[in-house]
């Protein structure tokens, strides 16, 4: 089922690299969804978790992962851990060589994600924190890439500060006509923003 889904994403031009393709084929999405949704794990759609959160649709995970151009040795910050699936895909995309710090504001979700990631062997590559992701994780900055999995009203200044010069942030932003996914590249004290597509995420809390 995973193979068929990934082939569809490849045909649609969403999966572009072997790294992301391999990551999506390796990470068992059914291990990151609630038991009642396991049969739907390889449908290309978001699925409910709890506390109003969702696990993102596979095409969105693939798109965001491709946008950061993953490579071994990267230090990545994820804001909005959810069930841990997105972090696991990123870990595989960097060949588990590097570090992913992921922060979740809902304590129950942070615990759920940590359990999933530890059970599946990602401990040591992925570190889960409970806290306000808008503030980032200053003690581990700067980051090569930042992925935000909830829609912000504005790009949080703390996240821009914690992005390495030349680093990439992928973030959905609430705008007048809807949410827009941006690829943000830091250039010295400035940022370059590129609109990618319209999206629908839960709000960044």
Swiss-Prot record:
Q: What top-level class of enzyme does the UniProt entry assign? A: transferase
Transmembrane stretches in the record are none
Cellular component terms, GO, for this chain's entry?
Answer: cytoplasm
Protein origin, superkingdom: Archaea
Active site located where?
A: 56
Question: Where in the cell?
Answer: Cytoplasm
| Keyword annotations of the record | Cytoplasm, Methyltransferase, S-adenosyl-L-methionine, Transferase
User: What are the GO MF terms of this UniProt record?
Assistant: protein-L-isoaspartate (D-aspartate) O-methyltransferase activity
Any one GO biological process: protein repair
Q: So what does this one do?
A: Catalyzes the methyl esterification of L-isoaspartyl residues in peptides and proteins that result from spontaneous decomposition of normal L-aspartyl and L-asparaginyl residues. It plays a role in the repair and/or degradation of damaged proteins.
Family annotation (NCBIfam families): pimt, PRK00312.1
Q: What is this protein called?
A: Protein-L-isoaspartate O-methyltransferase
Q: What species does this protein belong to?
A: Pyrobaculum aerophilum (strain ATCC 51768 / DSM 7523 / JCM 9630 / CIP 104966 / NBRC 100827 / IM2)
Q: What is the lineage of its organism?
A: Archaea, Thermoproteota, Thermoprotei, Thermoproteales, Thermoproteaceae
């Amino acid at each position: 089922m995973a193979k068929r889904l990934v082939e569809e994403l490849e045909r649609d031009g969403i999966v572009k690299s072997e790294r992301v393709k391999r990551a999506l084929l390796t990470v068992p999405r059914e291990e990151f969804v609630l038991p009642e949704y396991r049969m739907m794990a390889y449908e290309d759609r978001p699925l409910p978790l709890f506390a109003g959160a969702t696990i993102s649709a596979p095409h969105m995970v693939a798109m965001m992962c491709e946008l950061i151009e993953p490579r071994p040795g990267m230090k990545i910050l994820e804001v909005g851990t959810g069930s841990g699936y997105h972090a696991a895909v990123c870990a595989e995309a960097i060949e588990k060589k590097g570090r992913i710090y992921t922060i979740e504001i809902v304590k129950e979700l942070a615990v759920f994600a940590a359990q999933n990631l530890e059970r599946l062997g990602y401990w040591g590559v992925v570190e889960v924190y409970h806290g306000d992701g808008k503030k980032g994780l200053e003690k581990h900055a700067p980051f090569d890439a930042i992925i935000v999995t909830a829609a912000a009203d504005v790009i949080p200044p703390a996240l821009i500060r914690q992005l390495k010069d030349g680093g990439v942030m992928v973030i959905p932003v609430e705008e007048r006509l809807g949410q827009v996914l941006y690829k943000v590249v830091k250039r010295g004290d400035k940022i370059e923003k590129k609109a990618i597509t319209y999206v629908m995420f839960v709000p960044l809390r």
